[in-house]
Amino acid sequence: MAADGFVYRWLLFGTTIVLLAEAAQRHTASDNPSTYNIGGVLSNSDSEEHFSTTIKHLNFDQQYVPRKVTYYDKTIRMDKNPIKTVFNVCDKLIENRVYAVVVSHEQTSGDLSPAAVSYTSGFYSIPVIGISSRDAAFSDKNIHVSFLRTVPPYYHQADVWLEMLSHFSYTKVIIIHSSDTDGRAILGRFQTTSQTYYDDVDVRATVELIVEFEPKLESFTEHLIDMKTAQSRVYLMYASTEDAQVIFRDAGEYNMTGEGHVWIVTEQALFANNTPDGVLGLQLEHAHSDKGHIRDSVYVLASAIKEMISNETIGEAPKDCGDSAVNWESGKRLFQYLKSRNITGETGQVAFDDNGDRIYAGYDVINIREQQKKHVVGKFSYDNERAKMRMRINDSEIIWPGKQRRKPEGIMIPTHLKVLTIEEKPFVYVRRMGDDEFRCEPDERPCPLFNASDATANEFCCRGYCIDLLIELSKRINFTYDLALSPDGQFGHYILRNSTGAMTLRKEWTGLIGELVNERADMIVAPLTINPERAEYIEFSKPFKYQGITILEKKPSRSSTLVSFLQPFSNTLWILVMVSVHVVALVLYLLDRFSPFGRFKLSHSDSNEEKALNLSSAVWFAWGVLLNSGIGEGTPRSFSARVLGMVWAGFAMIIVASYTANLAAFLVLERPKTKLSGINDARLRNTMENLTCATVKGSSVDMYFRRQVELSNMYRTMEANNYATAEQAIQDVKKGKLMAFIWDSSRLEYEASKDCELVTAGELFGRSGYGIGLQKGSPWTDAVTLAILEFHESGFMEKLDKQWIFHGHVQQNCELFEKTPNTLGLKNMAGVFILVGVGIAGGVGLIIIEVIYKKHQVKKQKRLDIARHAADKWRGTIEKRKTIRASLAMQRQYNVGLNATHAPGTISLAVDKRRYPRLGQRLGPERAWPGDAADVLRIRRPYELGKPGQSPKVMGANQPTMPMPMLGKTRPQQNMLPPRYSPGYTSDVSHLVV
């Protein structure tokens, strides 16, 4: 129930709104007049009768006439005298309060009378609808303020011309027009409309020549001379019937109406009695149907009044030509309602532009045949589905001038062309001729600087990929050429400049493109990249080589320094290894020094105990293990030190193995080819200070970076680094001044194949192609394109690639260079040899120091030996004297008392252990006389011994006598001790005891 109540309330609300609207409409309608007089100024009685009949029928058409509204007609006959016409309008139409006036006139009577009606009615703001006036003057709303017409003006035929040119693909035309208002209007309409029209189509027509003539011609010969020298053979002509006869007559005499020429004329010229066969013209549909236009004008008026009644109050029309009725505001608003009408009438779709001129008017395309027969070959009419005008032409039915069925090219095709090129290896090589040269080589072509005034400009020869292509192209499509170099050495880019008096900036091209745009050259044969900016102003053939953009860089190389052999380890690791060697050596020494088992004595041996590991031996051991050298002596003795030694040996094995592996990786293995991964490399997108990239300023690559929004940051960075030419940039890449050069892939691949140190990085991006540039609308475009396609199919382009771009032998050598393992040379290992040299020099230096030190030590030792010898000699002398005195004293004692006996221990025996160690051991200081007889004899001097078989003199009587053997037989003479080893002698005087 709630839902039903909601619906009921909405229905009640809607009904109330409708009733209120109807009430408001009834109120408005009640304030508006119920009768409307429509005036007619017509050319004949039939038109007057048809006008009255149409209004009567209108009153019964509820679609256009509201209830209680009635239309009445008020007509007068159009008078040839415009002044009389003005009076008739005031007396017979305005006095009857006409709300609008429909005007027609005879085509032969001129436009003065319709203009008089327009002036008079416009002065009182009464709308006027013309059905036959087509002059351009009626479009001027400053004069004809309230004039509309159901027929288009003559100059609207320019719109149809553009459609026809687009249909036939003509790109260059000559416009012929009279110097009157309509002639200049059609030229202005063509130029204005073409600027917006060609935004929606691919083919753009340009005006090569404009020929303006004074009406009422007597001769057109002078203009024909200029037309004949022009390139275009398509003529768009606006002329009256009389002037067209003169033009066709003179053009026929110059053979400009025959084969190869195209004439497209307006309606008036189509009716000349000498129109040549093959001429195409336009004819307005329903142009002479006054009845149809009368009906359409009446219904347009009724439609406007009906809408105005529903929206506002219409004031009464002026009643007389007095001053009191000058400002009729309702008439001005009614004129605006009329301009907004769009209905389907008897003459087609009826609508108006801001000037009140008919739009959507249909035309027939007429082809003149033999005996001036007019044959309709097409229509320009309104398409209801697309809600716009559409051109339909049956090309097969057209007979062109010269009775040709094939469409003319519309242009005079020159067979001798001005061809421009530019130095760009390997596509174009430029060589200056020597002083003794007079011609180029067979594979070269002369190529002077374009428009150069210097006499030396002709001393250049060109060869290369593009030159071979040009030679073959000229043979294939049969043309001759003059080859020249770019005047400024640039491909060309546009500069925005402000023309005098212009509100907007216009593009002005430089370089090769500028020469082509300004029509100073016919063709560009060079590595010219196809891009949208250039294609807007020049024509391109199909690409003769497909390519893209890539990055050129120098292959990364490790710098081979004197310490290259140290590269496998970082500096930190080397320092740690050096420190570890000495730390381990120190710990080994300490472990061996303080271990209770660090020193021991060999069992069953008279030798001293083996010495412990000292610090120098520990260092020697640590280095020996690390360097994998044999250790002969100085090894640890304790178990703890030996455990550390084994761990150190394992450490040394790992370090040496790692060093060996990394040394191979650093010095022998293949180096990486590139440093950059491509255009998406983060180092390029966020350019760092140590990474510079650039391209050629004003080039197609430069334009590409300008277009790409995602590369804007990168472009702003590289813009300051851009070069004037690609050659300069490539040289800087080789020198290492530029890290990345971004350019066309064809050129960079060529450079990389020529120099093994250069390489292209990443994949191609910005793919495009090289094309041959021609003028916009050039007749050679299709022929050049077809020839290039044939070259691709026949393999000719592939042959040029192999010959000029991919140098097979150079590339093969680069591949062999890359595949061959890198070998270590002196540059890599020089540091090792220097290290050996330093070791040798250090050893020599140390031995010199040792020799010098030893000499100093020997000199010191000699001085000590001399002093010791002198002391020994002095001591010997003293001891000898003491010995003699002692002997004499003993002899005296012996002589005094034979029974006196000396204690054996009173005489000391000094032995030189250094010279006679064995004797020193057996005759130690603890042994004294008497002793072993043999020992006594061995130490006595010869003069103290008796003769063989006798006892010594020193023996007492109480002592047993022992026979002595012959010394000469039992003891060799050399075993006799020297005098200083006699009893009582010692080298140390302090030990001498007598």
From Swiss-Prot:
Extracellular side stretches: 24-570, 670-828
Main location, first listed in the record: membrane
InterPro entries xrefs: ANF_lig-bd_rcpt (IPR001828), CaM-bd_C0_NMDA_rcpt_NR1 (IPR018882), Glu/Gly-bd (IPR019594), Iono_Glu_rcpt_met (IPR001508), Ionotropic_Glu_rcpt (IPR015683), Iontro_rcpt_C (IPR001320), NMDA1-like_ligand-bd (IPR049872), NMDA1-like_N (IPR049873)
Residues making up the signal peptide according to the UniProt record: 1-23
Gene Ontology MF terms in the entry: glutamate-gated receptor activity
Parts of the chain that traverse the membrane: 571-591, 649-669, 829-849
Membrane topology (Cytoplasmic): 592-648, 850-994
Topology versus the membrane: Multi-pass membrane protein
Keyword hit for Transmembrane helix: yes
Pfam family, one: Lig_chan-Glu_bd
Biased composition range(s): Polar residues: 984-994
SMART domains: Lig_chan-Glu_bd (SM00918), PBPe (SM00079)
GO cellular component entries: NMDA selective glutamate receptor complex; postsynaptic density; postsynaptic membrane
One Gene Ontology term from the biological process aspect of the record: long-term memory
Binding of glycine, residues: P527, L528, T529, R534, S700, D744
Keywords: Calcium, Cell membrane, Disulfide bond, Glycoprotein, Ion channel, Ion transport, Ligand-gated ion channel, Magnesium, Membrane, Phosphoprotein, Postsynaptic cell membrane, Receptor, Signal, Synapse, Transmembrane, Transmembrane helix, Transport
Membership in a protein family: Belongs to the glutamate-gated ion channel (TC 1.A.10.1) family.
Subunit and interaction comment: Forms a heteromeric NMDA channel with Nmdar2.
Protein name: Glutamate [NMDA] receptor subunit 1
Organism: Drosophila ananassae
